[in-house]
Amino acid sequence: MKRMYIQAYCQSNLGDDLFVLHLARRYPETEFYLYAVGDNQKAFLSQSNLRLPRAWDRLRRKGRHMLGLGAEPFDGQGLDGTVVIGGSILWEGASLDFSGAPCFLIGPNCETEYSPAFRQRLEQALRNVRSCCFRDRASFEQFSQLPNVTWAPDVLFGYDAALPYQRGCGIGISLVSRKGAFRDDGLREIYCNAIADLCQRCLEEKIPLRLLSFCDTEGDEEMVEAVLTRVSNPASIAVSCYRGDPGTFLAEMNECETIIATRFHAVILGWVLGKNVVPIVYSTKQTRVLADCGFQGPMWNALEAASMTGETLLEYVKSERGRLDIAELKKRSGAQFAALDEYLK
């Protein structure tokens, strides 16, 4: 049995937690080490091949670092390799510390532009890993000259939610409030007002609503509260906050028929669940993936149009043009793991 270290964002973010679970379930005969602590372990406790640090492991790790005794398994050392899995991990200034050879990068995307110095560092880092599979074509094309670089649809297109399609009712709205999600505070305010206006119209038309928070750490729940303070009857709106129980959260999401998706993975999970999806775009990572998918439905691209109303968003919902057959994308997303399959299977 091989032992692998997982380098991932462990802050009870639904998308990132599902990355880790999908990875561990794909390789049940591999033992994975993941440094997630406290409540951030909750999503992984029932996954038998995921090794999580206990209190003693954390103390030992801290002590070894303080005494200069070097790294240990929960740093990725002494194992058979490292899997770095995540989306927006190659930002300008990222550490690019992909240690624990052989190292496999799964599912990242590039920024639109890098400084020449950082681009040079990133290219060298990519040369040194066993493989890197980007989740969009544009990111791949920046480094397509490297033989170990490929691309395939996002990992979560292949996620098995273990939920049959059900004809839901009403609208689920995935919210974000992360610093930097919108280019300025003014656009963030326009966003909040547009969502609140939509909610008010839905209340008046008796359309069921559910606000969705994918990650409290990044401020999604703050935006939920901000929206609720701007509607006349907030008690009539259901709220789902992800706290480390992906099964329950996805089941509640599945009860909706349309997903208005600001979170990147709300778009993909909405399609995985067979829903009508209306994307709200605040980043080029979204526009790239939507283009790769051939999505032709209505969306609010906040990168191009700063204004939006609840009335327009509701028209987008009612157009029922946001569904996408993802069968081929699901199949192709498995290529994210091609190099790792060869190494582990």
What does each model-identified segment do?
Residues 1-345:
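Active-site anion-handling motifs in enzyme catalytic cores
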